Design a protein with these regions (language model features):
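C-terminal extensions
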Residues: 1-12, 16-95
Length: 95
C-alpha cells in the first residue's frame, strides 16, 4: 500500500476510539495527520472534552503522527507503548 493510499484506520495503534478522537479533532486523512503536532492534538482533545485525558492517548497520537510522517518508521516505534516508555523516561516525544 502506498503512503497516499493509507487510511487512519491502517495505522498501527489506532483503534475505533482513536478514530473517534481524530474525528473530534477534525482529522480525516493521513495527510492531515502528517501536518499535526501530537502534543497540540492532546491539548486540544483535553480542552474539547473538558477533562484531563489519559496520557496514553498522547502516546497513541505520537505513534500515529510519526507513522503519518514516515511510512517506513521502525515497527517498534509504531506501537503506542514505545512512546509511553519514552514519555515516562522524561525524554522529549516526537512532534
Amino acid at each position: 500500500m502506498s503512503a497516499e493510499e493509507r487510511q487512519l484506520k491502517d495505522l498501527v495503534s489506532v483503534g475505533p476510539a482513536m478514530l473517534e478522537d481524530f474525528e473530534l479533532l477534525g482529522i480525516k486523512t493521513v495527510a492531515q495527520l502528517r501536518r499535526r503536532s501530537a502534543q497540540r492534538m492532546y491539548q486540544d482533545l483535553c480542552s474539547l472534552r473538558g477533562e484531563h485525558v489519559d496520557p496514553c492517548c498522547l502516546d497513541v497520537f505520537v505513534a500515529a503522527v510519526a507513522q503519518a510522517k514516515d511510512p517506513a518508521l521502525p515497527v517498534e516505534q509504531r506501537q503506542w507503548w514505545y512512546w509511553s516508555k519514552v514519555r515516562k523516561r522524561g525524554a522529549k516525544l516526537r512532534d
